[in-house]
Amino acid sequence: MKKIIVVSIALMLSGCATQVDKFSYLKQWNDSWQACDRQGKTSTLTFPASPWFNALAREDKIAVLIYLNELKDYQCTEDEALRLKAVLADADITTLNDLLKGFIYFEAPDKEAIQHLDQSQVEALAKAIDGPFNPLKVAEDLGMLQP
């Protein structure tokens, strides 16, 4: 799936003539999110101790974990994503922008699933996590995979 997106984007960019080398911005972003993806898969993160998190219902813990995972993935490639977005906006390539919207490494995560929770606690957890992580490993370490 990831390769299909990158190939589609490359084809769209190569067909658009502008003074900016859009392909180099795409390549930088692509290289960055691939590195972040590898980092997350190999992460040995120990989830920060948090009495607040421990007291949450299982569904809320899952929502927080998913949000934090998506946030750290996005933050890992945020600089490259912002540069690519700026180039795409200047070139008015709306099809490519639409294709990338919602891709976790291109957009900040939606807070809807955690909006009812204490945002200062979510932010504290986010600050305590250094970078991308493996959410399945963390969920397993926290005992969240058992029904």
PLM region spans:
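Immediate post-signal-peptide N-terminus of mature secreted/exported proteins
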Residues: 16-62
